[in-house]
Swiss-Prot record:
Protein family membership: Belongs to the universal ribosomal protein uS9 family.
InterPro entries membership: Ribosomal_Su5_D2-typ_SF, Ribosomal_uS9, Ribosomal_uS9_bac/plastid, Ribosomal_uS9_CS, Ribsml_uS5_D2-typ_fold_subgr
Biological process (GO), any one: translation
Organism: Burkholderia multivorans (strain ATCC 17616 / 249)
Listed GO MF terms: RNA binding; structural constituent of ribosome
Name of this protein: Small ribosomal subunit protein uS9
A Pfam family per the record: Ribosomal_S9
UniProt gene name: rpsI
């Protein structure tokens, strides 16, 4: 714990989020901007707020997030993972509920690398019979 802030690191795809939470009125600031300005899609906003709504802490904490790497979906997932870890740092009794919802587990799926001789990771060149 840093001062009165609780900390959690979240990761998803190639995005990394450093999340700091403290008691407040529910403001979420991502890279210096309000969350509604940073994430354009409503689904991204919903993903980020899931752990707070599950634990009934949506208006309880002020949250500051530094997130880098990846795209919008990856960053939203990383922020959700970081908020989950910060909530557990704040109150360990929340872990079972968050774990049952699947928020504690890091989503290990990464982009598969492109292979030599193929167009993409698995897409082969078109076969020509003649």
């Amino acid at each position: 714990m840093i001062g009165n802030w609780n900390y959690g690191t979240g990761r998803r795809k190639s995005a990394v989020a450093r999340v700091f939470i403290k008691a407040g009125k529910g403001d979420i600031i991502v890279n210096g901007k309000p969350i509604a300005d940073y994430f354009a899609r409503e689904t991204s906003l919903m993903i980020v707020r899931q752990p707070l709504e599950l634990t009934n802490h949506a208006q309880t904490f002020d949250i500051k997030v530094n997130v880098s790497g990846g795209g919008e979906t990856g960053q939203a997932g990383a922020v959700r993972h970081g908020i989950t870890r910060a909530l557990i740092d704040y109150d360990a009794t929340l872990k079972p509920a968050l774990s049952n919802a699947g928020f504690v587990t890091r989503d290990a799926r990464e982009v598969e690398r492109k292979k030599v001789g193929l167009h993409k990771a698995r897409r082969a060149k078109q076969f020509s019979k003649r």
